[in-house]
């Protein structure tokens, strides 16, 4: 009742604001993108049903590949075509590469002291340059190779134990543990198998809360200037703050662990070690851009969101598609075992360059099941034209890479899992081919792309080399569906349980 009264009291303000906004956004000579009719105050919020990427895909099939929606007072353009994506992410990249400011992203980025959610500007450019040069360079990436391989060795050992017992394996949980172990070791120096302040279950809970926070809806985001009152009355502010507090406690524990007296830095320092060392050097050298603790936490936050669940859900999707497609499973396993031989004791990253059909399987998984089917929203910094339509300044822009990757104009039988489609194709997924953009493109391309690709490829190669896979007794392959769930990261809704059989 209190929320309803609040709405009624604020109704005149909403209507006046909406009138002013619509006049500002619709100069008579502008050609705005088409879209569904808006309702007073809420705009198109009533049109948002189901998962956002599938909802937008359905709407775009009716209103076109460049579509205008209004989330409350906020204009949002959804792009669902290769051509539109290329204009936004390449031709007009500079004008379209900022980020919208929301309550949740301000929290999780420590007031935009990160590279994932911070608006475009000098601070963002300086921080991104530092991260790419110091944390994601080739030498640093290679120095962590032993971690990626060790964690996969541990995975194979555990799966072998399950295989000997012929017991089903919960692949969602197993693959999450694999990726979380890799990311936590190389980024935070934390071994979740024997850490004092976090374990596998804690990390899973934190990742879920992280995604809950990023996807959190605040009225302030849709009704700038007046929505804060509804958030306060409804308790949404308190909810978001409580979730963020738990995440911040974990990040602070990571920092405290690194600065405690007597701690020995390993031969290969982790990401936090490197950033702490940079902070000390900047204090001495008097650099114009100075790292702060908030910058450090913001980067940790980015790694947590982009590094853990994305690769884990991709691996899970890969196993689901392969078990449902025995022809492809046999073809890729035959290639792997013929090429690498039948007597390897362990798989290394050097093996990845030898298996070509396997690479096509990974490419097809990235096409059908991008972990984040909607790229993180951008915001225009000036008036631009996309596909002939006028896009006003401060308009949010969403690229529906899921819709593009299933566009029948670009792909034959787009909903079918068929790696063979890439046999005579030069299409790649590293941001230069706009029909396939699992990591984005342009200035906002995922800086951790190489780590993500390698994590998926190495994990999947291990699973397919050492084991054959069957469904549990009493189950049928036809029982395995591809229903989706999630908000920012889209995963398989039902648990995938398979039985590993040791191949040799």
Curated annotation (Swiss-Prot):
Keywords: Heme, Iron, Isopeptide bond, Membrane, Metal-binding, Monooxygenase, Oxidoreductase, Transmembrane, Transmembrane helix, Ubl conjugation. Its main location: membrane. It is a single-pass membrane protein. Belongs to the cytochrome P450 family. Heme binds at residue 446. This is Cytochrome P450 71B7. Gene3D superfamilies: Cytochrome P450. It comes from Arabidopsis thaliana. GO terms for cellular component: membrane. PROSITE patterns: CYTOCHROME_P450.
